[in-house]
Amino acid sequence: MKKQVIKAGVPETSGPFNLCVRYGDMIYISGLPPFDEEYASKLRDARAKGQPIPPFPDIPFERQVRIVMDHMKMLVDAAGSNMDCLLKVIVWLKDQRQQEEFDRIYRSYFSSTETLPARTRMQAGRTPMDCGLEVEAIGYVP
């Protein structure tokens, strides 16, 4: 088997990692912060020029969750799978008091409660650039 790097148009930040790797029928998705292309571009530019990291923009938490989950879906789809084939998800929230809002949106990305993956959710001491959350996942290709 050969490791395959999955590209799906999800904004990359020039960090020393791939966002998604497929190995055989397994999919590994790195922690995804809610970075849209505009912010990711500013981050790449700052890193390339050795400048300070730009502050994370003031984006409503609901929008941050949708950015992360949309990017996860894009990566899963590009790997030849679907959200219902995720096996394990790890969620870091900046503020645990936002768990209900997160859960409401998160559930909408799966076809039923039976297809929800195993999951760990915790409050992070600090998230990337102080954004509201980061989510990583492991899944399979049916």
PLM features per residue range, with description:
Residues M1-D70, M74-K88, L93-P142:
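N-terminal presequence-like segments and the immediate start of the first folded domain
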